Every structure is written in C-alpha cells, then in structure tokens.
A protein has these predicted regions:
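Conserved S/T- and glycine-rich ATP-binding loop of Class I adenylate-forming
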Residues: 12, 18-21, 43, 55, ...
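Conserved ATP/PPi-binding loop(s) of AMP-dependent carboxylate-activating enzymes
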Residues: 193-197, 208-243, 282-284
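Active-site glycine-centered loops adjacent to acidic/histidine catalytic or metal-binding residues
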Residues: 60, 141, 168, 192, ...
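Gly/Ser/Thr-rich phosphate-binding loop
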Residues: 76-79, 106-110, 119-188, 199
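Short Gly/Pro-enriched turn/cap motifs at secondary-structure boundaries
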Residues: 4-7, 187-194, 210, 242, ...
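Conserved pre-ATP/AMP-binding loop-to-beta segment of ANL
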Residues: 1-17, 24, 48-54
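Conserved AMP-binding/adenylation subdomain of ANL enzymes
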Residues: 36-54, 64-107, 120-123
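AMP-binding/adenylate-forming catalytic core of the ANL superfamily
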Residues: 101, 108, 225, 230-234, ...
Length: 376
C-alpha cells in the first residue's frame, strides 16, 4: 500500500468531462476539501444513512453520480456501497430487485430512464422479490414524470418509502435540491426544497428576481457552496463565460424551474429546450409529461424543426410500451391529450414511433441527434 499524501483543500481531486453529447466537452475540476465534505454530508442526510446500512446506486462510476454517490459520499461515511456493472434487463427484468433482496439493500438510487424501462414491463418481475429492506428510494439525472414516480412508489417502495428526487449537476458536485426523509416531504415530479445552505433563485429574461410563488424562471444559485467545480481544466475563461456571465455573480444552472405555493421547486428542463412556435415559448418537458400520461406511452422526446409559417414546429419521438397496429389512432389521442393539458398550440406536427431513444451512458436523451433527424 502507499502512504497517504497530505493534500491542500483546494488541490484538484479529479477532472470529469461533461456535456460531450451537446457540444465541446468541458473538463470540470473538483477539489479535495469542499467536494468530499459536501458529498459526505449530503449522502448521510438525503439518504438517511445509518451505520450498517447497505446502499446501492446503479450509476456508472464514469459520471458524476458514480463519483459522488457510489464512491466519495458513501465511503467517507464508512458505508457499504454496491457497485453494479450491467443492465437492469439482463438476464431478466428482475435483475435489480434480485440484487436488492440478495444484499438487503436499504437505500436505492437510480435514474428515471431505468424506472420507465422497468415500468414498461409491468410489475410481475417484482412479485417474487423481497424488497422489505428498502427504506429510501432516489432518482437522479433528469426530472421524473408523474407516471414513473407513481409506479416507483407503488411497486418498488410499496407506498412506504420516501422518494428523494434529487437535482444537481456535474458542475455542482453534489445534491443541491431534494426532499429529505422525515424532514422535507417528497412530492411527485418535484425536487422540492434546497439542501442546507443552498439558496436557489428564479430570474426572468432580464435577470430580475422572481420572488412570487407559482412562477417559472431561470434557475440560478445565489451563493457558492463547498462542492462547486472550481474551473474548467485549461480554460477558466470558458468557465466564467458559461456559468457566471449570464447573470452577474450568480451561478446559472442552464435549467428552468417552477416554484409552487409551498416553495417547492420542479425542474422544467434545460432552458435551451424551449421551442418558439408561432411566437409562443414552449418548454419540451411539460409536453413530454403530457404525452407520457397516455397509457400506451413508455417515453417521449420533443424537438423543434423549421416551419415556413410557424417559424418552428414540434416533432415528437415516442416509444410505446408494446407494439400496436392502430398507430394513427394513438397519434390522434396523443395530440388530444396535449391539447387538454397544454393547449392546441403545443400539438405535434410530426410524430415518429420508435423502438428507443438515443441516450448518453448516463441516460440523458441526445436531443442533438433527434434535431438532426427532425430537420431532414
């Protein structure tokens, strides 16, 4: 073994590249002191870790969730943390639940993409698995839609496990907004409240703060926190321009958010996922949520494409839970559902049924590829 090396708190701990699916990758630099303090503290509190618990995050350690909440956060608490290589469908769709039963997992943390894929197969694959050891369920990587949340709660949590819908980013290092079991109650599709010391604010296009409730704005963080990335490796100017130039001295997350009357935050998606149709700003996340409420839909993705009259039109890529012959009827039903939930302006001009959506290793939809397909 090697003797431990004494490090300065601000010495680089690791460099992790992000956003390669949407543009030139950025090498985010995280440091020894602040990063490990914050991941340790958030892990223990958000997941309500107790000594002796068995914790499992299904992420790949090659992305930030794996770094923060498979390795550094759990291990700094002396936790038993499970590492998994594989997919939830092999050798069958009981794989996750067999592992939970085998090791007596207490905290389970996964992505909405995985939940939707498993929900698509129904609940039969859970019936013969003992999930009684579970105490806390978590989601990470993207907002979770209502249908997936309810399935997760009912069939995995047995209506008895709090669900922490965690919001954070590679750049933040650790969880910034989340419910906390026994402290801050969960709420379907909401990340809920900021973690201790985090001060999120909503801004309008001019940079003015939106202080009222039941409002939508651009999500920024008012003040620094211990695990914020310190720079982009070899390009500090790009770091400043990317995260701090839009709204002076505030960290701009790039996400939009809705704040309800109780101060709970719901992430509405990337602000660059807003499509202007006939002068109306339409966010893709609410439209996708509406589509996903259809009983036959497994998941969906919306992108814009040029339209000579509207400026932009909406193109929907939709995956069904199983094959159906009457696709035209389903497409009509989807647009009727969108009209009821959002309005006629949000109806899809084109709908393409697909067996799956292109995704990064972390489960995020690669909209850049979908835009290229839609524009042809």
């Amino acid at each position: 073994f090697c003797d431990a090396e004494i490090m300065d708190a601000e010495d680089p701990l690791f460099i992790l590249y992000t956003s390669g699916s949407t543009g030139k990758p950025k090498g985010m630099v995280h440091t020894c002191g602040g990063y490990m303090v914050y991941t340790s503290f958030t892990f223990k509190n958000v997941f309500q870790y107790d000594d002796g618990d068995i914790y499992w995050c299904t992420a790949d350690i090659g992305w930030i969730t794996g770094h923060s909440y498979i390795l550094y956060g759990p291990l700094s608490n002396g936790a038993t943390t499970i590492m998994f290589e594989g997919i939830p469908s092999f050798p069958n769709y009981s794989r996750f639940w067999q592992i939970v039963e085998k090791f007596g997992v207490n905290q389970f943390y996964t992505a909405p993409t995985a939940i939707r894929a498993l929900a698509k197969q129904g609940s039969s694959f859970l019936k013969n698995c003992d999930l009684s050891s579970l105490k806390v369920l978590g989601t990470v990587g993207e907002p979770i839609n209502e249908e997936a949340w309810q399935w997760y709660n009912k069939y995995v949590g047995r209506n008895n496990c709090p669900i922490v819908d965690t919001w954070w980013q590679t750049e933040t290092g650790g969880i910034l907004i989340s419910s906390i079991p026994k402290v801050i109650p969960d709420k379907p599709t909401f990340a809920t409240k900021p973690f201790i010391g985090i001060q999120p604010i909503l801004l309008d296009e001019k940079g003015d703060e939106l202080k009222e409730f039941n409002t939508v704005g651009k999500l920024c963080i008012q003040y620094p926190w211990p695990s914020i990335a310190r720079t982009i490796w070899g390009d500090h100017k790009r770091y400043i321009n990317t995260y701090f130039s839009a709204f002076e001295n505030k960290y701009f997350t790039g996400d939009g958010a809705f704040r309800d009357e109780d101060g709970n935050f719901r992430i509405t998606g990337r602000v660059d996922d807003v499509i202007i149709v006939s002068g109306h700003n339409l966010g893709t996340a609410p439209i996708e949520d509406a589509i996903n409420e259809h009983e036959l839909v497994a998941e969906s993705a919306i992108v814009g494409f040029p339209h000579e009259i509207k400026g932009n039109a909406l193109y929907g890529f939709i995956t069904l839970k199983q094959e159906h012959e009457n696709l035209d009827d389903i497409k009509k039903e989807i647009n009727i559902l969108i009209s009821k939930k959002i309005g006629p302006i949000a109806k899809l001009d084109k709908i393409q049924m697909t067996n799956g959506l292109p995704k990064t290793r972390s489960g995020k939809i690669m909209r850049r590829i979908l835009r290229k397909i839609a524009s042809k």
